Each structure stands twice: as C-alpha cells, then as structure tokens.
A protein has these predicted regions:
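A short acidic, Gly/Pro-enriched loop at the edge of an enzyme's catalytic core
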Residues: 241-249
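Short, well-ordered coil/turn residues at beta-beta hairpins
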Residues: 53, 250-252
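NAD(P)H dinucleotide-binding glycine-rich loop of Rossmann-like/cofactor-binding domains
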Residues: 105-190
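Glycine-rich beta-strand-centered segment in the early N-terminal region that forms part
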Residues: 40-54, 68-110, 150-152
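Glycine-rich phosphate-binding loop and adjacent beta-alpha segment
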Residues: 256-316, 354
C-alpha cells in the first residue's frame, strides 16, 4: 500500500480515538465514583485547562446530598479551580477560572453586575456533558472566564480564588450597607467553613475589624479557625451570643435556625448579610426587621471586579497564611466528601489534586 495512504488512514483512525481522562463523578445521592471519562471537546471561544487543584464547595455538598435540582447525576461537579491552559491564546499560562459564565449582553452584564445575569450557567452544574465540572484532569472554559495569576501565587493556593471572591463580595456589600466603619462594628460570623473563615480573615486583616465572634456547633472546625485570626469562637447556643448585640451578622450557613438567630442578635438598624444556601425557606421575624429597620441582604457569588481583586489579595498574601487548606488526591475525593458530611474533617477547605 502506498505510504501516503497508510499515513492518511493512520491519521483518520487516530482522530477517531477516544481520549480518556480521570474524573470524580457524582452518580447519585452520597455517591461519587472516580472513573474514566471523555476529555472535554475543544470548542470555538473556549480553552482546555489541565487542572492543578480544585476545591470542594458547600454547593458541591448540596449536590452530594441530593438537594440541588440543578446538579443532575451523572455529573462531573466542582467549580473552584486552578491550572495550566493547554491550547489557544492562553496556552502555557497559570490561571484560575471564574466558573460563572454569563451572556455579556444583558443589563446586568453591561453594568458590572455579571453575577445576576439571567442567562448564567456554572461549571460543574448546568453546562453540556462535554464541558462539565472541575473534579477531573481537564476542563473546558470560555476564554473570557480565564484569569492569569502571577508566578509568585502558588496554584494550590490560587484554587481558592472563587470562595475568596464570594467572601470579599459579601464583606463589601455589608460595608456599603452600614452606617459606621466595619472596624468599629461588633460582628457575628455564623459558620466555621471556608466562607466563614474567609469573611473573618478579610474583615480582620483587610478591614481592621477586631471584634469578631464566630459560631459553629462543630468544635473541630471552630478550633481550627481560631488559629488564624483573633476573635471569640463559640457554639451557636453560647451565652456570648445575646439578643440585639451585633452591628452586622454574616450568615454563611443559610439554615432556618441561623436566620432566626441572626435577626434575634442583630442590633436595631443593623445589617444581616445572608450568604449560605442550605435551606431556601422558613420562619423569620419580619416584625423585628421592620420595627427596628434591620437591613437584610442576600449576596450571591461576586462581580468580575471582585474576582480580579481577589487574585491580587491572594497574590499579596493580604489574608495571611493559607496553611488551613487541606490537600487530598482526586481519586480519594469520595472519602473527603464523606468526612465533610459526617463532621470528622476539621479543615474548612479541602482541595483535590488530580
């Protein structure tokens, strides 16, 4: 057979070969399987990221518990990620991905509030099969969602850019709603997970707030957070948390019981920043909220500007050491989810490494 024909046939057969990566796949309630999956498909306007590190978010836990109708099994979940781009104009660059993909054309996108875009989708939630989440060796992302990181920012640490942006956005929204500086406020942070700790670090190390109380029923997490900023660390039922005693409350939990406590303990004229999404409904003391002019604000994700500023915050180490992050192998990700579920994990953030 002619040599040129042989080469052509080899090229055709090679181009049809299925390229396989490893991924952690959500397959059902409290079930994750580490298995082979097809590589993401190269698409116009997108680039392929070789994942370096990916963080487990509270919303990933919601999916794990079967409580997120937007994340339908089987699905590669995960959206907090850092890595190296494999193709296109960013090829070879160390980057993080903004997982919130928006239309860029609506009134929100054109006015700096991209996170409220009615057409938004999220990596690891509601994208097509071939472009799913980041608990994998590879993931595809629109080029406009790619953010380069400076060489001195470790990619392991860069992986928490997304939750840090969530916390920064919440703190800035709270700051704008207050009638006095954050540095003068008595602050309650409900929840000793990653968002709770990141809010506290931004409040204390960037905003000069040294009067923070953090509450959580999990003693392991609470004692771990106590290593990283000065404050009081208590159980939600502790006597330290008195009615009408806090200028601002950050609810990073989002349970009915945490909302009830937030409205009870906030001062007249105070501010509640609601970040957590665990329970979507429940009782709330609207009488107090009305008669005492309490400001209740839900905060969702972050703007593009918040995301850019977060990379600078991490690169400049403005929130201190990040040795509270715990790293696990992606292939052992199912075990990490189980430990977060049963409360035996003390770290506020687990990051998975492929």
């Amino acid at each position: 057979m002619d040599h040129r024909i042989c080469c052509f046939l080899f090229f055709i057969l090679s181009s049809k070969r299925k390229i396989i990566m490893k991924a952690l796949v959500y397959t059902g309630v409290e079930e994750l399987i580490y298995r082979d999956e097809k590589d993401p498909v190269e698409t116009k306007g997108e680039s392929i990221l070789k994942v370096h590190a990916s963080g487990i978010c509270g919303s990933d836990m919601h999916a794990y518990h079967g409580k997120d109708e937007r994340r339908i099994a089987p699905l590669i979940i995960g959206h907090e990620v850092s890595g190296v781009i494999q193709n296109g104009k960013f090829q070879g660059k160390n980057v993080v991905l903004n997982p919130l993909i928006t239309c860029g054309k609506c009134e929100y996108c054109t006015n700096g509030r991209e996170h409220l875009c009615p057409n938004r989708v999220l990596l690891g939630m509601n994208r097509p099969y071939e472009r799913q989440g980041v608990f994998a060796e590879l993931v595809s992302s629109p080029n406009q969602n790619i953010y380069e990181v400076p060489d001195h920012l470790n990619l392991n640490e860069a992986a928490i850019a997304e939750p840090t942006a969530v916390a920064l956005h919440a703190v800035l929204i709270g700051e704008n709603a207050l009638k006095k500086p954050l540095s003068e406020c008595r602050t309650l942070v409900q929840g000793a997970g990653a968002i709770g700790l990141l809010c506290s670090l931004i409040l204390s190390k960037i905003k000069g707030n040294n009067n923070i109380v953090m509450s959580d029923p999990n003693k392991l997490r609470l004692s771990n957070c106590a290593k990283y900023f000065d404050g009081k660390f208590v159980n939600p039922a502790d006597k330290e948390i008195k009615n009408d005693s806090f200028d601002i409350v950050f609810d990073t939990v989002g349970l009915e019981v945490s909302r009830q406590q937030s409205i009870s303990v906030v001062k007249p004229g105070g501010v509640i920043i609601h970040i957590g999404l665990t329970q979507p409904s429940g009782e709330f003391n609207f009488r107090k909220a009305t008669l005492q002019e309490v400001t209740f604000i839900g905060t969702y994700c972050y703007t593009n500007k918040d995301f850019e500023n977060t990379i600078k915050i991490l690169a400049d180490k403005k929130i201190g050491k990040l040795d509270w992050i715990e790293y696990r192998e992606l292939k052992k990700g199912a075990e990490a989810f189980k430990q977060i579920h049963d409360g035996s994990c003390s770290s506020p953030k687990i990051v998975l490494l492929p």
